[in-house]
């Protein structure tokens, strides 16, 4: 699979006090398309949508991917709250598809 960048994936869990904890995962060889200002066929309706494919060879635990998690473009530091990402390009995960079969097994993430 051709790759064109890296992402930082923040998976949300809750601690004993029911407060959010953001677990950080860095994927350095991913394919991503779209994002802020990308407007090819659907105009501004889908201008902030992003699609990311992570080759399965780089995924240690496919169960970390959940709708509502956060994708940040590039390699970014750990966070304790979502406002820590204020000055980075980030997206909320809106879809997760695990494609384990075929020529290019990968995790496909959609975000807004």
Region annotations inferred by a language model:
Residues 1-27:
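Active-site-proximal polar cores
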Residues 20-112:
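Short, conserved turn/kink motifs that form compact alpha/beta structural patches or helix kinks used as
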């Amino acid at each position: 699979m051709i790759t064109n960048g890296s992402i930082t994936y923040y998976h949300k869990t809750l601690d004993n006090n029911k407060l959010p904890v953001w677990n950080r995962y860095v994927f350095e060889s991913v394919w991503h398309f779209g994002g802020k200002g990308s407007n090819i066929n659907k105009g501004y309706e889908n201008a902030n949508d992003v699609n990311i494919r992570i080759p399965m060879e780089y995924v240690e635990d496919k169960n970390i991917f959940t709708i509502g998690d956060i994708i940040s473009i590039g390699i970014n530091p750990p966070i304790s709250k979502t406002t820590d990402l204020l000055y980075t390009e980030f997206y909320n995960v809106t879809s997760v598809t695990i494609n384990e079969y075929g020529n290019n097994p990968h995790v496909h993430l959609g975000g807004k």
